[in-house]
């Protein structure tokens, strides 16, 4: 685990050095969490997208494609719940002026406890040698059990608080755990507030008459609103699927992890419509089919 950040830095360096990914607008100091796919990166991305499209659409008689617009009527996002619920719980540190996702701070706290569990296991492995039984040790060692109970308790409370939109309790949990700013060590926190992840824009000739729109945060809604159009014009019978690839946008405040969490990204998505009562059958089918596809890319 200690080598993971260094390995990740090497991957990022390699991606830039060999023309796969560049920082967007780099000559103007760049733009956080926005990247350009370079000469080799775009070819790799194009190959994966075309391979995906052939496997998902062209090789299946009951799956068709769609290219929905990025702009959609704002009621779409109200009906889908994105306007009211597509949020991240954010908290600011008053001293460092840095903003964090409250749930990530708590998850990082739990990750540190996981590290303590790993250390206990390694110590026991070294002590007992070949006779060491990892599963038995984890289920019987009082310290490990205590650590596990702590993690379960913290994550359970956080989950319930977020589900109930009790942001005061999320802050209380951070304070009770004495979670500090990762940069300064300060524990001087603001209240937790919900921040909507959709980018807003305007449609119209003037500011007064312009309609408020959003850059789509996902491609799925374009499929859902076109369901009847596709079904009627394509004479599709359930079960059938609609696939789409395209840009999506999310205003990630705490963006990190290189191209794995970007503000502008591309999705490849299939929505498969089935008859009630056949969920398990189709879930197993697609789980196996998609796993085989990913393994065919050498991801095993």
Predicted regions and their residues:
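TRNA-recognition modules of translation machinery and tRNA-sensing kinases, especially anticodon-binding
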Residues: 2-300
């Amino acid at each position: 685990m200690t080598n993971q950040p260094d390995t990740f830095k090497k991957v990022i360096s390699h991606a830039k050095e060999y023309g796969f990914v560049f920082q967007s607008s780099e000559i103007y100091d760049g733009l956080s969490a926005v990247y350009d796919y370079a000469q080799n990166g775009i070819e790799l991305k194009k190959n994966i997208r075309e391979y995906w499209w052939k496997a998902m659409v062209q090789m299946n008689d009951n799956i068709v494609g769609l290219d929905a617009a990025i702009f959609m009527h704002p009621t779409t996002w109200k009906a889908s719940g994105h306007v009211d619920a597509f949020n991240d719980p954010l908290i600011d540190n008053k001293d460092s002026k840095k903003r964090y996702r409250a749930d990530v701070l708590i998850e990082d706290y739990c990750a540190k406890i996981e590290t303590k569990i790993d250390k206990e296991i390694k110590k026991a492995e070294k002590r007992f040698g070949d006779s060491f039984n990892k599963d038995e040790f984890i289920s019987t060692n009082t310290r490990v059990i205590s650590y596990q109970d702590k993690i379960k308790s913290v994550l359970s409370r956080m989950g319930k608080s977020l589900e109930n939109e009790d942001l005061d309790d999320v802050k209380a949990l951070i304070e009770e755990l004495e979670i500090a700013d990762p940069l300064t060590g300060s524990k001087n926190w603001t209240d937790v507030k919900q921040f909507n992840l959709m980018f807003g824009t305007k449609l119209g000739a003037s500011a007064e008459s312009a309609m408020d729109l959003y850059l789509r945060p996902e491609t799925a809604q374009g499929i859902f609103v076109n369901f009847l159009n596709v079904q009627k014009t394509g004479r599709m019978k359930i079960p059938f699927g609609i696939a789409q690839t395209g840009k999506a946008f999310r205003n990630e405040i705490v963006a990190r992890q290189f191209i794995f969490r970007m503000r502008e990204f591309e999705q490849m998505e299939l929505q498969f419509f089935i008859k009630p009562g056949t969920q398990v059958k189709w879930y197993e089918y697609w789980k196996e089919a998609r796993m085989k596809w990913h393994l065919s890319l050498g991801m095993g």
